[in-house]
Every structure is written in C-alpha cells, then in structure tokens.
Amino acid sequence: MEQYIMKGGNPLVGEVTTSGAKNAALGILAAAIMTDDDVVIDNLPDVSDINALLDAISHLGAKVDRIDRHTVRINAANIHAVTVEDEHMRKIRASYYFIGALLGKYKSAEVPLPGGCTIGSRPIDQHLKGFRALGSDVKIVRGAVVAHAIDLVASHIYLDVVSVGATINIMMAATMAEGETILENVAKEPHVVDVANFLNSMGANIKGAGTDVIRIKGVRRLHGTNYSIIPDQIEAGTFMCAAAITRGDITVKNVIPKHLEAISAKLTEMGCEVVEFDEEIRVVGKPKQRHMNFKTLPYPGFPTDMQPQMTVALALADGTSVVTESIFENRFKYVDELSRMGANIKVEGSVAIVDGVGSFTGAQVVAPDLRAGAALVLAGLAADGYTTVDEIGYVERGYENFEEKLRSLGAVIERVDSEKEAQKFRLRVG
C-alpha cells in the first residue's frame, strides 16, 4: 500500500532543480548499445523506468557501471543476445527502442510488446512500417516484436501520424543502414533532438532533427562518447503548474526555456507571472486566475504530458475552460478522481469542459497513470485537509524524488506504506 499522504493549503515557494529528461534518457540508453566502445551518460534521472532499462541492457550482456546516481558507463562489446527477456520491459513503453538499436547494430531483435501507462492504444504500426521500409522482416510472435534483416537499406519513409517513438526508433535503425534515409512528418520534440545529437556524438550522420524532415546517412560503425542529457521539459512544466495550482512562487532551475514556451504562454494567459532567465523560469501564481482553452499538439504545441497538470490549474481558475486532447484517447481517466476532491469537469469524448471551483477538499484518490498521478498530488497540495494518492509507482516511473522536491518548496507530504504510518502522519501534522 505505497501512497503519498499530504495536507494541503500551503502555497509552494522556493527553488527546485529539474532532473534529466526521462524520455530522452530512454532513447539514449537504448542507442548506447550500438557501439562496442565505452559510452558515459550524465544527467540521468534516477527513476524506476531508467533503472529497469539499465537492468535490461545488463541482461543483454553489456557492462553497466553506475559511476554515481546520475552517471552511467555502458560498454556493449560483449552483448550476447538480441532477445530482450526482462519481464520489467513489459511495463515500460520505451522498451521498443531496443528494436531500432538492436536491428541497427546486429540486424536482429526480439523485444516484448511495450507496456507503460494505459492512456490510449498507442499502436506501434509506424515503427514496424519504418523497419520494413529499411528492409527488415518484422512479425509479432507470442507477444513480442521479432525483426531480422540481411542488410538494412536506406529508404524514403513518410510517417502517417506524427510519432515520437517511431521517429526515434526508425532513426536509430537507419543510422547504420546503407545509403541515405529520409524521414518525413516526424516528431520534433526536444527529446527526439537529444537522441539525434547523442547518435551524432557517436559518429552518426543525422541532419534535420527538430524539423519536419530528418536525413540520415548510414555509417558502418559508431564510437564511444561522453554525453549529458537535456533537462526534463515535463518535470519543469509540472513544477511550473504547481505554482499556479497552489498560488505559490516557484523558480525552476536547470531548464531550457524554449522547450517550455507553450506551457509558459498558457500560464501567462491564466494570469500567472512568468519570468524567464537563461536556465531558470520563475512562476508566480495569483489569487485570481483566469479560465482559458488549450489543445494538446505535437511539439512545439502544448504537450499531452502536461494536460492533466494544466487541467488541475484550470479547475481552480475563474470561469469555464475547454481542454481538447488530440494525442491520446484515454487521457481524462483522472477526472473521476479529481471530482472526488470537488472539481467540476465534464468529459465529452476528447474534450473536457472545466468549470472552475473556489477550492478542493482532500480525498483518497488513485493515480491512473504517470502524469495524472503527479497532477493529483498537486491537487492534493492545494486542497483543504488530507489527501492520499494510491498507485504512486506510476509517479515514480517519471519523477525523481518527487515528494522530497515538493517538501523543499514547503509541501506537507510523505510517502507511506501502511495505514499505521498514514495515521502517524495525521497525528504529527495535526
């Protein structure tokens, strides 16, 4: 019974430092097995998804050395298998990156179908389309993707839908294909660019990452590198929303402001004060915040991973807001939980109508996925009384030391694993 318990009502105030980007790290770690040389990766977030992926890399036969909590050295010279069997991988969406990495380097891969948060069907058909276009035979066999190729040959590939995962996966495989691959209608998210930059630091020839068209000239081999992962855009945005939700004053450090422009713009539209510095952003929530509308879109649009957090902020704003989710079809599952705290939200298909209320009341809620779990925690910190959030394993997949960082901002929150500990918390806090 691991859960967060908190007593809300305190504005969050202070400074918090963003960890490395989990979504970039997942792709970069998979790509690290594409060379026989040492690869040193810094600014790695210490979260459960990353640790599970490192375990899987080790099980393939690579040597994995944790230099410190946020730095790892990987040497894949002695990889002895192209089959990912680790059961933990079935719980991680990004396990599919092993397909592109193994196929690119060894021309063969067998990887369990991905798991992760249940926020939509999220098919991998675009990944498979890309691998087949590069000359690989791809089948789904007993719950796993099985891919084999005699040689990978460059191709001109147009993605039918913009997909971050497919963009990264095909890009990795094409890195060691013969000739120049052209990828069109690709994702432009910061972590796509970061994975491309990492591959280039190992000797890949990738141009255009961050634009609509990526060109990849295949190379015969990749070499070792030292690389530092970019800051986490979504973690930074979560703490920015925390300032709005709790009417606080938070400076988020170790950020790239350009990656946060859509979030900053919407918080400003709500009436928050947003001040950008070179590597910091300060957000000051206001007693009265305005309603506004937003729609999730691929980058540089508003990120779907920030939709629950921003919706919580709007649920406490004046007036009626409209939230349109255009990326995943099941991303409003947290609304029923938020309603237990007093939110007034009606969901009609891919649209949520949010009527702002003056305050939330503490309740026992359950996190349905990673980002919704974080949003429910922030709602609890703004609520009157005590809130417990169950299924926090989702949250810990993507946020490093979440409750510790919140406590540093003045939150009254603890992670407990029994009702007895929860009761002690209530008695101590009063």
List the model feature ranges, each with a label.
Residues M1-G430:
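Short, structured segments at the rim of ligand-binding sites
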